[in-house]
Regions:
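Short glycine-rich or small-residue beta-strand-to-loop segments that form or flank ligand, phosphate
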Residues: 56-65, 89-93, 201-202
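Membrane-proximal low-complexity regions enriched in glycine and acidic/polar residues
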Residues: 147-236
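Short, Lys/Arg-enriched, Gly/Pro-containing loop segments at transmembrane-helix junctions
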Residues: 306-313
Length: 313
């Protein structure tokens, strides 16, 4: 057996090993490969940048655990930006399987901001006291308070009917939030009674929820809307960008990495998150795949020519 035959018949487990190494190494030691920004992603960032303090933002988390690696870093980055800009954030989901994902992402972000606030107080030598709910007593506006600065409505069945209900009233459609507290008593809804009062709505989805939000939400109640989706479905939303029905779009892990880069560059966060690290691994694996395809095809052609066979292209 010739060298070329041996190479072409190599045990595929060696390839699996190379792919595993290409994934694990960048995750353990991020390469920080450059992330190129795209206009659709920048448009969402710029829109949030223009919103004055106290503006109302709704983020709908409409995806299941199968899309979590791509889309969860996206919503965490958006939450960080909204909180850094001191916007009033309402989040919800139309996907039953996404209820826990949205809560987890929101909890992570809120705890990060409030932990940083408490650390700043400790460094200044100032004492602080938490109430029985874990809320810091006497905190200023930089401390995030549930029901005032943010709220999580949770899941409600009905899809388009839920959106139409929100167009009439947030508190009537969701009488209680995800933790069971009455929404009518939450200060965040004092000036945000329905979808018409929104300054921005962003749908992060792995389903057809984006089209539904456009049809029954944006077009009826005239709020600005952006979207985030998995990479495989990003192209289907470009017509909505071209028509102006979407002001911006985050596509897959790349879109999440772009947003992480923008909030870091703007000084809202210290370092890139999971999406940027994931893009390192994804890029290396893609490069490795291309190299393997080129090498194997090259040796295949060499073997054919040495054997005197005609090669068809």
């Amino acid at each position: 057996m010739s060298f070329y035959d041996k190479l072409l018949k190599i045990d595929r487990r060696w390839i699996y090993l190379l792919v595993a190494i290409a994934v694990i190494v960048p995750l353990l030691k991020p390469l920080r490969l450059p992330v190129t920004l795209t206009e659709p992603a920048e448009n969402i960032f710029k829109k949030i940048e223009t919103l004055p303090e106290g503006s109302h933002v709704l983020i709908s988390v409409d995806f299941a655990p199968s899309s979590e690696p791509e889309l969860k870093p996206m919503i965490v980055a958006l939450y960080r930006h909204c909180f850094a800009k001191k916007l009033k954030l309402v989040t919800m989901t139309l996907e039953a399987a996404g209820a826990a994902l949205a809560e987890d992402a929101l909890s992570i972000t809120v705890n990060e901001f409030n932990a940083n606030y408490r650390d700043d107080l400790a460094q200044k030598g100032e004492e602080y006291v938490l109430d029985k709910y874990g809320v810091l007593k006497g905190a200023d506006e930089d401390y995030l308070v549930k029901g005032e600065d943010y709220t999580y409505l949770g899941y409600k069945a009905g899809y388009a009917l839920v959106v139409l209900g929100l167009g009439d009233s947030f508190t009537n459609t969701f009488s209680k939030d995800y933790s069971g507290e009455a929404t009518s008593s939450q200060p965040i809804f004092k000036d945000m009674k329905s979808l018409s009062d929104l300054d921005l709505m962003i749908d992060i989805a792995s389903t057809a929820a984006v089209e539904m939000w456009i049809t029954y939400g944006k077009e009826r109640y005239k709020f600005d809307m952006g979207a985030g989706c998995t990479a495989v479905s990003a192209t289907q939303y470009y017509p909505f960008l071209n028509s102006g029905q979407l002001l911006g779009l985050l596509g897959g892990l790349k879109g999440a990495a772009e947003y992480e880069k923008m909030i870091v560059d703007a000084g809202y966060w210290v370092k890139p998150g999971l999406a940027t690290t994931g893009m390192d691994a994804q890029s290396i694996v893609h490069f490795l795949t291309v190299v393997i395809v080129i090498i194997t095809n090259f040796f295949y052609l060499i073997r054919k020519r040495r054997a005197g066979e005609k090669t068809n292209f």
